[in-house]
């Protein structure tokens, strides 16, 4: 047998037994990585020598590239060397790196070097470091080596490389033991990693580096808080270090823009503002808020895929009855919210300036304000109200209405209003910020003025403005109609005469243009995600661009011959758009347009379509066609005839109907005979007696071959069907009349499988063929 044979040596083993070979010859051998994983003694002994280990590490971290070689081969030896040093099946190579003096010096020199890395060497380095940090052979020896180097400085200088960014993000996840995790956290604390990240954000000159630094900070924070939510011990020194008030204040100060700051300086600072806002947003997002407005709007389920940390921060308390888990918060004192709320007036001023200057900073800042509005903290909402008064907030609404196509801006502002209106506090108080918007803030009056004023802009601009204004009104209307509405909110609205008129306008608009709004997942006013803006465009944005293209399209262009297989052109029908009435009557109806765009392509009506090519001629089709033409109209027997006192009942099956009518028994003394061209009887008398399946042996009259349309076939005996098919087309298929040895003429059914009325298999088969709809429902 094959296992009794001696194992043949491969080319690598034969090479190691010779005297004239080099390390390069070994690395270029096709079996070197495979045999290294297997731990071949001869190969391990050769590689783990001091000079070879140093050479492998030098090849991985400081390769000398021959530019004369093709690009594919320049880093070939470096890649193979890094693969050997990071083999998972054994610790022997990694242990040699941290215990051999030559390799230790090589690694220290590399980490202390300030030369920028390229993406390939960064990948080799990240892979080696991950293997070293995940091994348990001697953790203290590994960290004692790293503490002598400028590891974090080296990584932060090359943070723009994806491999380095991932290495820092996963640093607290790499160790496989709790002791290893503790050592890594102590190392990060001693090196002041978070302070270095924030300082590097200010010093960096490229926008990409700022974004990568913010992402590293956020990922480490999410990982720490994920563990805090599920661990019994809620003490984490590294998390406490990240929550240092001085550090948070330094991050928040990056959002401050002086009033006299020129537009050019604001553009230069936009990347720093966006990165800082992203970090503060992660702090607020991962701090659990009981009964948050986003939960009331049923938005959390949609964010489970992208917002991974929510599985512990928000969904876990919903599934766990442990009161301690309900009350735990990583930031119970709301430190981040307080620091940010104190700077909110300046942040709102920056948002307004950036919107008017057509900048990009308003988007991350508004997302940060949205998270601040989703906190259910009275002190925070009081500071929000103060900031709204100082701006005032209605100026943001007016600036957004000056940009009717800015759907993302509209969506974010609507979310701010929604979250404030749905915030819940003890004693059923209304958010001070929401109260300001509904009273002295002038939000209702602004919505009413826009709804009742003509707009001379283009159709697209009018429709975008109309949707934004309508969504603002819907936000107030739905807060009023909530399951448990706020009594103070109801009192404010009932005392406002403008709201009474505006409510009627909102109701009429929704009745005509959004009849199924509660099921419309494209509506940005409520159903669009509070936290996830992957579909941040509102309902108007989904069709206004398309409507513009349709309006500019010449209707005659669609009447051209589109495909040679069709003898007549398409006939577009745009009449349904002319039914729009009311304000902005020159714009198409958004609901009708969306319905039209959602129809399948094959539902378009094309009059007079025919194909010029002939269909495929199947064997036996010509004979069937000639026989069918000479046959007189026949009477079709019922699918399930019943034996009743000598009277035979017949029933019609309508051609193409696809639905079978159960057999009936007429009154005594009557016989009902229905032809194919007759009318279906209105009354059917159902016999409750046991059915008789003796008719299964009867062959039906010949009909056109419906190919695979079994819904219009009568239930007949498989034997009869096989005989009929064989007799009608035996001359068309070669060899059809020749049977194998032992094969009956009705193969695959022989005499022992004749159909009987008592055979349960035939009963089920007949029922499934005659009533496919019933069987599918069952």
Swiss-Prot record:
Keywords: Cell cycle, Cytoplasm, Cytoskeleton
Annotated stretches, region: Disordered: 609-642, 714-778
Feature: compositional bias, Basic and acidic residues: 620-630
Keyword Cytoplasm: yes
Assigned GO CC terms: astral microtubule; cell cortex; cytoplasm; cytosol; nucleus; phosphatase complex; spindle pole
Record-annotated membrane-spanning stretches: none
Role noted for this protein: Regulatory subunit of protein phosphatase 6 (PP6). In complex with pph-6, promotes actomyosin contractility during cytokinesis by regulating the organization of cortical non-muscle myosin II nmy-2 and thus contributing to correct spindle positioning. Also required for the proper generation of pulling forces on spindle poles during anaphase by regulating the cortical localization of gpr-1, gpr-2 and lin-5. Negatively regulates kinase air-1 localization at the cell cortex.
PANTHER family for the chain: FIERY MOUNTAIN, ISOFORM D, SIT4 YEAST -ASSOCIATING PROTEIN-RELATED
Oligomer and partners: Forms a complex composed of catalytic subunit pph-6 and regulatory subunit saps-1; the interaction increases pph-6 and saps-1 protein stability. Interacts with kinase air-1.
Protein name: Serine/threonine-protein phosphatase 6 regulatory subunit
Originating species: Caenorhabditis elegans
Biological classification of the source: Eukaryota, Metazoa, Ecdysozoa, Nematoda, Chromadorea
Encoding gene (name): saps-1
């Amino acid at each position: 047998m094959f296992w009794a044979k001696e194992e043949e040596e491969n080319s690598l083993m034969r090479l190691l037994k010779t005297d004239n070979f080099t390390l390069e010859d070994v690395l270029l051998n096709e079996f070197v990585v495979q045999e290294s994983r297997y731990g071949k003694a001869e190969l391990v002994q050769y590689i783990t020598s001091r000079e070879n280990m140093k050479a492998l590490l030098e090849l991985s971290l400081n390769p000398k590239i021959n530019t004369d070689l093709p690009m594919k081969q320049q880093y070939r030896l470096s890649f193979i060397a890094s693969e050997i040093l990071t083999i998972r099946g054994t610790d022997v190579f990694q242990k040699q790196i941290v215990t051999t003096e030559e390799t230790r010096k090589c690694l220290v020199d590399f980490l202390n070097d300030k030369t920028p890395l390229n993406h390939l060497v960064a990948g080799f380095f990240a892979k080696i470091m991950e293997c070293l940090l995940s091994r348990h052979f001697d953790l203290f020896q590994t960290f004692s080596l790293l503490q002598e180097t400028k590891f974090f400085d080296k990584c932060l200088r090359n943070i723009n490389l994806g491999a380095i960014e991932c290495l820092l993000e996963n640093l607290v996840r790499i160790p496989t033991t709790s002791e290893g995790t503790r050592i890594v956290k102590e190392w990060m604390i001693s090196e002041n990693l978070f302070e270095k990240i924030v300082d590097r954000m200010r010093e960096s000159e490229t926008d990409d580096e700022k974004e990568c630094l913010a992402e590293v900070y956020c990922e480490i924070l999410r990982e720490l808080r994920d563990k805090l939510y599920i661990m019994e011990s809620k003490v984490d020194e590294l998390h406490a270090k990240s929550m240092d008030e001085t550090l948070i204040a330094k991050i928040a100060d990056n959002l401050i823009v002086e009033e006299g700051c020129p537009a050019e300086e604001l553009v230069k600072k936009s990347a720093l503002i966006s990165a800082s806002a992203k970090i503060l947003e992660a702090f607020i997002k991962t701090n659990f808020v009981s009964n948050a407005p986003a939960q009331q709007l049923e938005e959390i389920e949609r964010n489970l895929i992208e917002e991974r940390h929510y599985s512990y921060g928000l969904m876990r308390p919903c599934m766990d009855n442990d009161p301690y888990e309900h009350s735990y918060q990583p930031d119970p004192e709301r430190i981040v919210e307080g620091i940010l709320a104190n700077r909110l007036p300046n942040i709102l001023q920056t948002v307004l300036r950036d919107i008017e200057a057509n900048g990009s900073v308003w988007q991350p800042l508004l997302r940060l304000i949205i998270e601040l509005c989703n906190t259910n903290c009275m002190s925070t909402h009081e500071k929000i109200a103060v900031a709204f008064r100082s701006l005032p907030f209605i100026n943001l609404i007016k600036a957004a209405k000056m940009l009717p196509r800015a759907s993302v801006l509209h969506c974010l502002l609507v979310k701010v209003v929604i979250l404030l209106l749905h915030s819940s506090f003890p004693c059923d108080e209304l958010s001070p910020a929401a109260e300001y918007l509904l009273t002295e803030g002038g939000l209702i009056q602004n919505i009413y003025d826009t709804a009742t004023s003509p707009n001379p802009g283009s159709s697209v601009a009018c429709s975008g403005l109309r949707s934004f204004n309508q969504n603002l009104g819907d936000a107030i209307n739905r807060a009023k109609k909530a399951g448990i509405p706020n009594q103070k909110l109801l009192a404010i609205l009932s005392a406002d005469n403008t709201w009474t008129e505006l409510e009627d306008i909102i109701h009429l608009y929704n009745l005509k243009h959004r009849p199924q709004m509660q099921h419309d997942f494209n509506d940005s006013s409520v159903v669009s995600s509070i936290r996830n803006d992957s579909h941040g465009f509102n309902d108007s944005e989904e069709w206004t661009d398309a409507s513009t293209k349709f309006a500019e399209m010449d209707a005659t262009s669609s009447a051209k011959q589109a495909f040679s297989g069709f003898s007549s052109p398409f006939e577009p029908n745009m009449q349904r758009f002319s039914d729009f009435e009311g304000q902005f009557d020159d714009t198409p109806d958004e609901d009708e347009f969306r319905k039209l765009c959602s129809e399948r392509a094959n539902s378009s009506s094309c009059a007079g379509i025919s194909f010029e090519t002939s269909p495929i001629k199947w064997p036996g089709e010509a004979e069937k066609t000639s026989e069918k033409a000479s046959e007189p109209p026949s009477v079709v027997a019922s699918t399930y005839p019943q034996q009743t006192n000598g009277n035979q009942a017949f029933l019609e099956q309508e051609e193409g109907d696809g639905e079978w009518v159960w057999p009936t028994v007429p009154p005594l003394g009557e016989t009902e005979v229905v032809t194919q061209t007759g009318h279906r009887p209105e009354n059917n008398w159902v016999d409750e007696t046991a059915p008789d399946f003796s008719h299964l042996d009867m062959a039906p009259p010949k009909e056109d071959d419906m190919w695979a349309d079994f819904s219009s076939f009568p239930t007949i005996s498989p034997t009869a069907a096989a005989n009929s098919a064989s007799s009608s087309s035996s001359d068309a298929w070669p060899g059809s009349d020749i049977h194998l040895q032992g094969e009956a003429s009705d193969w695959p059914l022989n005499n022992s499988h004749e159909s009987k009325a008592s055979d349960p298999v035939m009963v089920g088969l007949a029922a499934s063929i005659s009533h496919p709809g019933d069987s599918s429902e069952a």
